[in-house]
């Protein structure tokens, strides 16, 4: 059995790859730690009221379903659903920190059994960009459009792009995710 004592220099030469990996992982996590520390500064006021109108049309609050209530209880922000005077629905999600719980609406619709078709980017009458798709289930068709807006008015149509911009502090909150649903049957 050859038990030779390694010099400090030999030991360091063998261990440097592990140290490099540890430093790289630590550096990669720095932006996420900074966001957590600043989350309380961007917290949403608990007393903030939801809007009474959207683009000049009256909003009527709707109750959240049991599934939505369960999700909302764990959500880092607040969620509300409204009937719009034009017959569509509007879901508002206010978020006070970057979270993967704010995910694409298509994931939710797919998860409750709808088939997703024709995903596309669209501009509305005010030239605002939305990510839209058609959801189809048992002969019913709805058009769903979504976007996320930060505190400075910058918008995102891709939740992953929003998440990384928010996590790296390139977008400041609080943020509001808007999801419009129109019946197309």
What name fits each language-model region?
Residues 13-34:
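Hydrophobic membrane-insertion alpha-helices, especially the h-region
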Residues 49-166:
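Short, solvent-exposed recognition patches
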Residues 26, 57, 178:
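A residue-level signal for conserved active-site and pocket-lining positions in enzyme catalytic cores
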Residues 1-17:
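Cytosolic-side transmembrane helix boundary signature
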Residues 35-55:
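Alpha-helical transmembrane signal-anchor/signal-peptide segments
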Residues 164-167, 172-185:
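Surface-exposed amphipathic alpha-helical segments
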């Amino acid at each position: 059995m050859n038990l030779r004592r390694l010099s400090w220099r030999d030991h360091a030469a063998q261990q440097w790859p592990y140290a490099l990996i540890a430093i790289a992982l630590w550096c990669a996590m720095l932006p996420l730690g900074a966001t957590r520390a600043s989350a309380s500064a961007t917290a949403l006021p608990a007393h903030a009221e939801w809007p009474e109108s959207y683009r000049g049309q009256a909003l009527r609050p709707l109750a959240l379903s049991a599934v939505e209530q369960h999700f909302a209880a764990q959500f880092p922000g607040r969620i509300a659903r409204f009937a719009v005077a034009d017959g569509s629905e509007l879901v508002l999600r206010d978020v006070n920190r970057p979270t993967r719980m704010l995910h694409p609406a298509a994931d939710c619709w797919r998860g409750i059994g709808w088939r997703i078709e024709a995903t596309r980017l669209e501009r509305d009458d005010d030239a605002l960009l939305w990510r839209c798709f058609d959801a189809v289930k048992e002969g019913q068709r709805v058009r769903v459009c979504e976007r996320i807006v930060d505190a400075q008015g910058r918008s995102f149509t891709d939740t992953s792009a929003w998440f990384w911009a928010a996590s790296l502090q390139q977008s400041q909150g609080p943020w509001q995710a808007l999801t419009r649903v129109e019946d197309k049957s």
